[in-house]
Amino acid sequence: MAAMVRGWSGRLRGALVASVLVVTACASGPRAPGPPSAYLGTVVDTPVSASVADLPLITDAGQVTSLAAWHGQVVVLTDFLTLCQETCPLTTGNLLMMDRAVSAAGLARRVRFVELTVDPNRDTPSRLRAYRTLVGAPANWTLLTGSPAVIARIWRYFGVWYQQVAEGNPPGTDWLTGRSLTYDIAHQDALLYLDARGRERFSVVASPNATGAPIVPALRRFLNAQGRANLSRPDASTWTAAEALSPIAWLTGEMIRLPAN
């Protein structure tokens, strides 16, 4: 369950389209891509504290790592849970589209996509591996879990809210085990961009517009009524894969376009 929090409330879709065209125009000219539009999110320039960057996390491969492990790469960090029925499958679909564009631009080794759970009690490494296999996550993706205390500390540091809530009625059915779900996690939908020096540079707080995104059938079936509405009728406050590429272009200094379908 995603909390109804938006980063672009009240913005005009036409203004957003115009701003994206400006970024694209800058990228195609002699200068490097400029900062993303304020309609998309917030430009920041804050070093991630070592007390957070060095916290131990566990990858889907069962290896211990930390956010500091990707210094030297641009990191796109998002919160998620594998049992989200409203927005996380849509976010994953958009990130897959973005990754294809990054790879097509020859930047796969310079950009790391990281999905860090807000449900550490259920999202074990083995479950994250199953999710990776299900969605076909590329090599430059990392799915992360950790102790509840570490997960809470990291997301509190970045200002991303989440909370355990009651499961809906009727409850959803786990796409992996076939069992009924017993609780849900309400959470903000955030995209955080860290530069190669490990500094937070841009943040987006909004739900995804996943029109045309590659969402696997199992996760489409897993969506609840709100999730299906989010997929078929995205509102004007949502972000698209094309829009979310602009911070990566800015931080890498390279033009990035979504490949033609």
Regions found by a protein language model. Name each.
Residues 2-58, 241-261:
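N-terminal targeting signals for export/organelle localization
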Residues 74, 80-81, 99-106, 135-139, ...:
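Sec/Tat-exported extracytoplasmic proteins
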Residues 68-95:
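Short active-site neighborhood of thiol/selenol oxidoreductases, capturing the structured segment around
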Residues 197-261:
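C-terminal lobe and adjacent flexible extensions of AdoMet/dcAdoMet transferase-like proteins
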Residues 92-154:
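Structural microenvironment flanking redox-active thiols in thiol-disulfide oxidoreductases
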Residues 50-52, 74, 186-188:
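Short, small/polar residue-rich loop motifs at catalytic or cofactor-binding pockets
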Residues 55-75:
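A short beta-strand-turn-helix
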